[in-house]
């Protein structure tokens, strides 16, 4: 699973998810991509589940690029603990994804296979997404 090797601060502020993604809005490595149409936090487990769904459907053919990384920690208090007494313990890692960001890219397979693989991956993610092709240069 994807986790940072080391971080400067264990507990981060939640931050705001305003507007569109600044960069990474075009397919740059592969031929086809999965672009987010809504903003959300995506956990490292969801990224891994989407990756497995894609690679299993493609029968280990083609190449997959994961263009998001869960660098932000989120915290949670234990169940049954009263409010107050500081921030909770780090619970997991998330990748904040804004709308417009291309999350996954695929190359080396036909468009039909890529479309279905990315559709299966999109069911594992909490964001609405669409299939995009590389722009002709």
Curated annotation (Swiss-Prot):
List the SUPFAM superfamilies hit by this protein, alphabetically: Ribosomal protein L16p/L10e
State the Pfam families in the record: Ribosomal_L16 (PF00252)
Q: Which domain of life is it from?
A: Bacteria
For molecular function, the Gene Ontology terms on record are:
rRNA binding; structural constituent of ribosome; tRNA binding
- Gene Ontology CC annotations of this record: cytosolic large ribosomal subunit
Which keywords describe this protein according to UniProt?
Ribonucleoprotein, Ribosomal protein, RNA-binding, rRNA-binding, tRNA-binding
Cleavable signal peptide: none
Q: Does the keyword RNA-binding apply?
A: yes
> Quaternary arrangement and interactors, per the entry?
Part of the 50S ribosomal subunit.
Entry's family note: Belongs to the universal ribosomal protein uL16 family.
What name does UniProt use for this protein? Large ribosomal subunit protein uL16
Organism this protein belongs to: Streptococcus thermophilus (strain ATCC BAA-491 / LMD-9)
Lineage, broadest ranks? Bacteria, Bacillati, Bacillota, Bacilli, Lactobacillales
């Amino acid at each position: 699973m994807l986790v940072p090797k080391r971080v400067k601060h264990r507990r981060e502020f939640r931050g705001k998810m305003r507007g569109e993604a600044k960069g990474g809005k075009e397919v740059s490595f592969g031929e086809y991509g999965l672009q987010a149409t809504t903003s959300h936090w995506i956990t490292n487990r969801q990224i891994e589940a989407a990756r497995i769904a894609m690679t299993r459907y493609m029968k280990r053919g083609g190449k997959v690029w994961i263009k998001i990384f869960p660098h932000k920690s989120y915290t949670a208090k234990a169940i049954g603990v009263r409010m107050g007494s500081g921030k909770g313990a780090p619970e997991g890692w998330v990748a904040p994804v804004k709308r417009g960001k291309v999350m996954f890219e695929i190359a080396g397979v036909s468009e039909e296979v890529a479309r279905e693989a990315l559709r299966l991956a999109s069911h594992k993610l909490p964001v609405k997404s669409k299939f995009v092709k590389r722009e002709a240069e």
